[in-house]
Amino acid sequence: MQLDPTILVIAAAAAILLLKLLLSRRAPAALVAEKIKAGATVVDVRSEGEFRGGAYRGAINVPLQVLSSKLDRIPKGRPVVVYCASGSRSAMAVRLLKKAGYQDVCNAGGLHQLP
């Protein structure tokens, strides 16, 4: 039995889209705005180059690839809002921060989705 290569490509693309959706789990915009207004630490997990190219006002840059070794830059006693370019890296960062003991962390998605 042979499978049509087109069907395999479509199935792979659908799996990738589903994975991205499951990984991103972006917080509602109203919740993100509320947390920022209440004084949340806003963390940009994009690369330093991306950050220099434009960032959310007041955000700190802790690239995802060094986040686990730079946790001391993010206070634990305040809410944390994390963003990246699309929401995928920030979703990974949220999981990492929660495993590290951060309680109030949310994924804002991409930079252009912030209030």
Residue ranges and their predicted role:
Residues 1-41, 45-53:
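Flexible, polar/low-complexity N-terminal or interdomain linker segments that lie immediately upstream
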Residues 31-32, 66-70:
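Short acidic active-site motifs
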Residues 43-44, 59, 97:
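Conserved small-residue
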Residues 51-57, 74:
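Short loop/helix-cap segments at secondary-structure boundaries that form the rim of catalytic
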Residues 53, 114-115:
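Short secondary-structure boundary/hinge segments and terminal tails
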Residues 62-63:
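Short acidic-hydrophobic, aromatic-tinged amphipathic segments that line or gate anion-handling sites
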Residues 68-114:
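Catalytic cysteine-centered active loop of the rhodanese-like fold, especially the PTP/DSP P-loop
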